[in-house]
């Protein structure tokens, strides 16, 4: 048996010597000779794969253990390369102490140093030494820290340069400079080092003080950290990979932004200069007015910005005494405008990244008009959502590809390891057969490969054995580490693996939840060492382990660490396989491969086997040791002092405590205490009474004492040695210690910092809350996987912060105290010092870059700021943050959120709750029976209540007993027939010997842990069964009846009634879905009871019976008729028969489609009527009265509809439908408000509130519109997981909120001066605190106010955090926090500067992680639902799916007749021109030129420029018109058969009309709005869209968008509905709010239109803080509660509670749900589109095939001659092309020929497709599929039966040639014989006339010329002599044709291309 990894032992490592080099040279020479010897055959694909380097022997990887132990003397020495790939390369390897591989070139370095030179060897040794890289890394880090300081001496710089130079020299000496592979400059990372050093010397030589640009290059040194740390290189690789992939998206983004920017330029140029100017201002002066000259310009109240306005009817208007005029500058320092293409592009980029876009939106709408909202809707939905998410999709895909590669690498390693294990296993068996004790391997220290600490290990093993603990938790199966190890070794593991814990997931396998501490002490287990070893070696999974030892408590007095916490209560944790062999019996495979004992008779082999086993043992131990955290000496010390075994009484005391702390009720109590403690902490607020404060303090002390006691008890019960091996316990211990510290410290000072630690206790809930646990794990895993990425992000932030500081710090006017003052104003965001620079960069990463950039551009040069900010934005925000999201999404997997982790642990909390419930039910039963026996009441029997099943008709949904442990326990108490004795039932949860049974579907049973039932208590598993035919259906129904026969009298239909109707066609009908859950006698998990289809459903599917069944159901549910027999009526007798007829009539009315349409129409009308009830309704009495009447009419109609449905459907059916309930509630609201109005109670507050609920009316449309209903159903499916994540987010945020309350409660108040606009904060030198503010208030203008959004209590804290997480309004909160001093003190500028960090940490963990978890959850959930639907899209209706599939297939293709060339010679000439490719290219170039000329346009351009541009435009219109006319002239009626031509035609018509209109309108400018002119000019932009035709990558992305459209339309519809309802609510609640912040005369809730404007803006969560701000006003100085309003109400204050609820719910619904659904759809369709585009053959390739075909087959006969095939194959492009010479490839394709040597189109396409895709099963299905499609769309192919094939013809050809040659040779021999004078001819015998020619002539004829036509089968067709060929083409002789084909191909190549088709 050969060991798979080469020879074993130190022979693997051979020094690199001159002999080794000579051997390599020999190999290289041999390789070259071999290469020359075999010239590559032309026309043949080189199938042989090139050899590749081994993955695990790559440079920078660690050498795997199985290459043996590296002797110390070979560390750092040149060794021969182990990778066979490099046997022909001049290389050698060097290994350092940690076995890391470094590969070097064996050529001379710098032409001076050979590989054996002493200097070079020393350099090599130094360069691979670990201390060298540590020294360099430390130097780089110190250098980075120094760079953040400005006051350090220049000499320090030189020191660093010297170190870097030394490093470079060492590397160059060791590797060589650049010529050969593995030299210094061949590694791109070294380019970075080299450039840094070069620049340092350039800087030293020239004085660089003036050139700050070059100085900033020093910053790149931070990147050197990447090159030093190997893990980072991989991530950078992924980043670069994703940037490459972004090329197409970047092009598409730039293209779309350019188009939108051009539209913006045409529509809005110059508009943002419109401002309100005082009446009477001189017009010439107005033109030069800028915002600085504030005297004449109206300033918007509450801001410092001028009020913009427009002259359109729906634009913003000026106040009285002001008029709207165009001035000289734009808003925001003149940077926000559409005046030129560049500024418009910047504005559009800002819109795409959604930074402060609401400001641009409001400015533009105010200046241009509300109708332009359409432009913003398009840009936000197409530009922002679509493009940004495409970037996410691309990055995600790039990351996944990288991950797949990594996985493949791991799998390759795993495979090798398995092979090694098999070898080891066999050798082990042989050793055992020879009687060698395998445990003696541990003492096999003579071998150089012996495990390092085998002798240390032995005593530990013995000491453990002597402990004699038989704790079942130590068994191999239950230890998570071992499971992981076994799975790594490829063995089966005990517990079923949850689907997401795959070994090869995208992250390192995380530790098992149930055992967070990984392994017990050092990974070697109690019990028999040898059996454990053998079980690993024999590959026997834990499932075969046989029964495990059980004991209620360990025999040893030490209770062990896990006993009682996870594995207690005697529940089996291993999955016990039936019939598993007990003991170390060999499996069959093992016996089969058993090696003979003779094999090891020779001493050498025995020795070798020992050595192999020893190596493999060391590999296994290496795995174990990787888990060893402590050195062995410390472990023995810990075992001695930290396991407390004293006198028996102490042990007894320990036992008692042990029982106490492991009881489920103890766990429940602790959990309750954590919850109550959290509530206590959350109750802190400001202002707080002393008594309340004292109560909280007392509570804190009580809880601290309680948790301290818990910790003490656990330490005593478990012993410290075991207690501290659980991570949760360590966590507990830290928190308790900190709490005690906090109690001991004084009340003031660092109190709040310590307090925050107490909050972490909330995380203990994760032990009993699976979702929280899972999300913490996801964040943990992501942070783990993201460790490197986070580091890269940190480096990026660091570098950009430093660059910013170096380049810009001087421009910000920095003072000594670090405050930046510019134009007399203090700046918060500047780059004066590193901390502020870091904050600016961090803010850009949060997506807020534009405002910082404006300030930067004001203080510095524009280009530096633009470059810096946009680079950070694109690199940091778009790429790195998206990579983060990609990793987060990958951390999710299938059933993470739906099912809690299957970790085999009985959840103590659930056990405790189950016990309580069981006890409660027992108590209630006892009380019931007591009352019954005493009062002698005849109550219905409990048995019937609990056990009775409804009759068969409703069997569909109710025939299952829930898995829920408690329900099962309780529900079965009253069913003695189902289980054992009654008294045992309550205990079945905790007692494995008690089972409860339920009928189980045949063939379904599984053996699983009982824990899963309790674990999945609240889960439901859905199971579908599809009966395979009539028999099964009947059987199922029969079973359903039997199932209930014992319990209920049969009613409804039975299977006998069904039998006659179930014909053949119902055989494959699927039964409806049934929630299948149950507990049975063989399974305590997921057993499914019998699935019963509803017979009525089956019958409804039979058309003949559908009519009869079309009757109303019973009116009342079963329960009513059972309790009140009067409800049960006989419909065949007189009074009820009439009623029955009425019901049937109502039923037919309600079911009629016209009725439904009428109701939908009414719903739409009534919803529309609500939109008119706005703030100005009182001013329109006529409209008001109409609305009142219509409201009554609608209410009556809806009430009538409801009554009709009650009569038709009956109460049971009506009230069991969720949509009907919705209708019922909404109708009741309308009815109540109507009655209140009639009774004149409509002014009562509660009735007013109820009236606002009429806004819910549109919700009724949901159930009627299929598109929306589909989306809502998908959403409802996702609600459980969304709520789960929402809850977990709230817990996360609770911690930050309580922390915020501790840090900032009461500190946000300030003294403001109300005279300024906006209110200014009074200087803290003038007013220091609250009392000062009141004392100084002589003028009455000073107010002591609080910031509206603050941290005074936890609820407000949540609101503040929501604003921070959505980055809206967060600046004000941060400024207040940073300026805060103390409670009731006046804030001071940046007093607590480092409070910024609180927000930074929250944004990373609270904002970034939790909000992206939503994306993850939603996408994940929709994928789940998709799987359930069998991969169909869940957001589309059936109709839309048809569109989607049509888009995907793009119709079945067929050869089209090409447009015939016109006969007229002039037309023919033009036809030749327009069908040339060059013509298309020229037109494309002109379109690009046109685009460029449109970009040149600006606002305020000179008259001359306008004229020139006008002429150029006219020229382009003429050109495109000319093109259009030419094409129409040449192509005639065929012009309009092409969609693009139609598009061109429309664009040309629009362009001409826009020219005419602009001429007309310019003369009538006073009558028309110039806006109309602008819209018409947009037609020109349509021309640009023609460019899309040319770009394939962009087409794919747009194709993805087209495929997304139906689903996006549905989601958009739902979003519109939500906006509609909220805008009605907004009008009812906030119409009278004061104009302030985001609310003004245009953006408000006064009318429906304005409300929609506001709601569209906050759909992306933009500016919601501004809309909320005025609603939070409750009184002076902000608003006046007594001010009368126009609609009769009083006050302009808001209602904070309603406002907060309104905005937070809207943001959660729209932003988190709807927008994320949008993302989910785009990601999905992008994947589909790219899959289709990355397939080897796409639709485009087939199109191209047909286009080429048209040229060769102008008559569309579908056949071409075989002679033309070679040219056809060469003319094709893309993957289908077969370049010349291609004859033999085509012949080998074996194409069928029809008479006339013709080949059919489809046969060629199949053959070429096969040539690209290779042989595969899918090809056959594709072939039949294509054939069917083709037959459907084309004339029948059957008329042409093939008579031969190309291969057959070639074989016949060659056969003929061979026969001819043989005959000639024969004749030649004859002639030679005859010319021989000695030969006597015997002509009469031969009977053949002899040739007269001589020998030479004959030879010339045979070899020189080739007269025989059959030998040149290149361009001419075969001779038409095939009629004689029979059709049996199967008997093809395999004549070797390759040589003749090769000759022929060479001939063909020489002859050149043969002519194509005529």
UniProtKB/Swiss-Prot annotation:
IV repeats lie at residues 1459-1758. The modification Phosphoserine is found at residues 440, 443, 466, 478, 611, 614, 1452. Residues 43-54, 1947-1958 have a biased composition (Basic and acidic residues). II repeats lie at residues 646-910. The chain crosses the membrane at residues 126-149, 155-174, 188-206, 213-232, 249-272, 373-398, 659-683, 695-718, 727-746, 753-772, 789-809, 864-889, 1149-1172, 1186-1211, 1218-1239, 1244-1265, 1285-1312, 1393-1419, 1473-1496, 1508-1531, 1538-1561, 1574-1595, 1611-1633, 1699-1723. Ubiquitinated by NEDD4L; which promotes its endocytosis. It catalyses: Na(+)(in) = Na(+)(out). Keywords: Cell membrane, Disulfide bond, Glycoprotein, Ion channel, Ion transport, Membrane, Phosphoprotein, Repeat, Sodium, Sodium channel, Sodium transport, Transmembrane, Transmembrane helix, Transport, Ubl conjugation, Voltage-gated channel. GO terms for cellular component: axon; C-fiber; plasma membrane; voltage-gated sodium channel complex. Glycans are attached at residues 279, 288, 311, 334, 1323, 1329, 1337, 1500, 1687. One of its GO terms (biological process) is cardiac conduction. Residues 150-154, 207-212, 273-340, 366-372, 684-694, 747-752, 810-833, 855-863, 1173-1185, 1240-1243, 1313-1354, 1377-1392, 1497-1507, 1562-1573, 1634-1647, 1671-1698 are extracellular. III repeats lie at residues 1141-1450. Residues 1852-1881 form the IQ domain. It is a multi-pass membrane protein. It is found in: Cell membrane. Residues 32-42 have a biased composition (Basic residues). Pfam families: Ion_trans (PF00520), IQ_SCN5A_C (PF24609), Na_trans_assoc (PF06512). Residues 1017-1038, 1933-1942 have a biased composition (Polar residues). Expressed in dorsal root ganglion and trigeminal ganglion. The channel consists of an ion conducting pore forming alpha-subunit regulated by one or more associated auxiliary subunits SCN1B, SCN2B and SCN3B; electrophysiological properties may vary depending on the type of the associated beta subunits. Found in a number of complexes with PRX, DYNLT1 and PDZD2. Interacts with proteins such as FSTL1, PRX, DYNLT1, PDZD2, S100A10 and many others. Interacts with NEDD4 and NEDD4L. Mus musculus is sensitive to the pain-inducing components of the bark scorpion (Centruroides sculpturatus) venom while Onychomys torridus is not. Gln-861 may account for the difference between both rodents and its replacement by a glutamate, the corresponding amino acid found in the Onychomys torridus ortholog, allows inhibition of Snc10a by the venom, which in turn, inhibits sodium currents, blocks action potential propagation and may induce analgesia. Belongs to the sodium channel (TC 1.A.1.10) family. Nav1.8/SCN10A subfamily. This is Sodium channel protein type 10 subunit alpha.
